[in-house]
């Protein structure tokens, strides 16, 4: 079934220029809708973890997310007195109180999660935004004004502090999703984008910006890497000298490995998760 679905989506993607809400084969519409529904329920995800820092990205699922925009017209959506005009409904709009309780998720107004995202049991959405295709795992808090971009993958027991931004894949078009692994703490107003992977148990200080072109400098080893924060790292914003010291350029600095002191200042509060 999955292979047939993948083949159908791949073929539709190759012929996407010919698709529209009024001109698309029913089998393509049904296939795309099936993928979105499975993403919404957490049975499919854009990327799956094989090990620490090792992920397999399912490009065909990302293609289905993009095709869903091609196949739908905007429509009027209401939330109380507020009106919206969009192609993607919100995730929780039509759930009853019992259905919401069964999800095990706490959603603080005016948090928004789009249909096609998955929010696991024990997660908390403060007034924040979770885009289509994103996956937020158990026990994670998405704090106020944080944004989980399209198809971003967030692990278990992660804290995304206020104003954090995780980049999406839809625009500008990115090959791989941004990934935050289990037990990470992302400090306020930090941005992780362009498919960067933050490996498990890492702490990103507030105001750190990491993209694929950002040098990640380990002050202990002197090594510079790109696109990946090693497991258990504590990262702050900084600069590296360039051109013989004539000027410096921004870098993310690994200052140490996570220790007991770090854990004591970034631990999750179980009282908030009752």
Swiss-Prot record:
It comes from the Bacteria. The keyword Acyltransferase applies. It is an enzyme of class 2 (transferase). One of its GO terms (molecular function) is nucleotidyltransferase activity. It catalyses: (S)-2,3,4,5-tetrahydrodipicolinate + succinyl-CoA + H2O = (S)-2-succinylamino-6-oxoheptanedioate + CoA. One of its GO terms (cellular component) is cytoplasm. The keyword Iron does not apply. GO terms for biological process: diaminopimelate biosynthetic process; lysine biosynthetic process via diaminopimelate. Substrate binds at residues 106, 143. It is found in: Cytoplasm. PROSITE patterns: HEXAPEP_TRANSFERASES. Its EC number is 2.3.1.117. Pathway: Amino-acid biosynthesis; L-lysine biosynthesis via DAP pathway; LL-2,6-diaminopimelate from (S)-tetrahydrodipicolinate (succinylase route): step 1/3. Its main location: cytoplasm. Keywords: Acyltransferase, Amino-acid biosynthesis, Cytoplasm, Diaminopimelate biosynthesis, Lysine biosynthesis, Repeat, Transferase. Belongs to the transferase hexapeptide repeat family. Homotrimer. This is 2,3,4,5-tetrahydropyridine-2,6-dicarboxylate N-succinyltransferase. The lineage of its organism: Bacteria, Pseudomonadati, Pseudomonadota, Betaproteobacteria, Burkholderiales. The gene is dapD.
């Amino acid at each position: 079934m999955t292979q047939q679905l993948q083949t159908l989506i791949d073929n539709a993607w190759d012929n996407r220029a010919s698709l529209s809400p009024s001109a698309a084969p029913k089998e393509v519409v049904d296939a795309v809708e099936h993928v979105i529904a499975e993403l919404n329920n957490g049975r499919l995800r854009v990327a799956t973890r094989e090990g620490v820092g090792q992920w397999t990205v399912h490009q065909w699922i990302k293609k289905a997310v993009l095709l869903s925009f091609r196949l739908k017209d905007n429509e009027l959506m209401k939330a109380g007195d507020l009106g919206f005009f969009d192609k993607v409904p919100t995730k929780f709009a039509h759930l009853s109180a019992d259905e919401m309780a069964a999800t095990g998720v706490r959603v603080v107004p005016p948090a928004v999660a789009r249909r096609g995202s998955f929010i696991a049991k024990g997660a908390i959405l403060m007034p924040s935004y979770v885009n289509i295709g994103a996956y937020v795992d158990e026990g994670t808090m998405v704090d106020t004004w944080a944004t989980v971009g399209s198809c971003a993958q967030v692990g278990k027991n992660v804290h995304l502090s206020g104003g954090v931004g995780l980049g999406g894949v839809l625009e500008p078009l990115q090959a791989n999703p941004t990934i935050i692994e289990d037990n990470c703490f992302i400090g306020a107003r930090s941005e992780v984008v362009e498919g960067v992977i933050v490996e498990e148990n890492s702490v990103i200080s507030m105001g750190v910006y990491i993209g694929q072109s950002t040098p990640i400098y380990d002050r202990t080893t002197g090594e510079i890497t790109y696109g990946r924060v090693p497991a258990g790292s504590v990262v702050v914003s900084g600069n590296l000298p360039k051109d013989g010291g004539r000027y410096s350029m921004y870098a993310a600095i690994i200052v140490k490995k996570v220790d007991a002191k770090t854990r004591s200042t970034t631990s999750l509060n179980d009282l908030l998760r009752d």
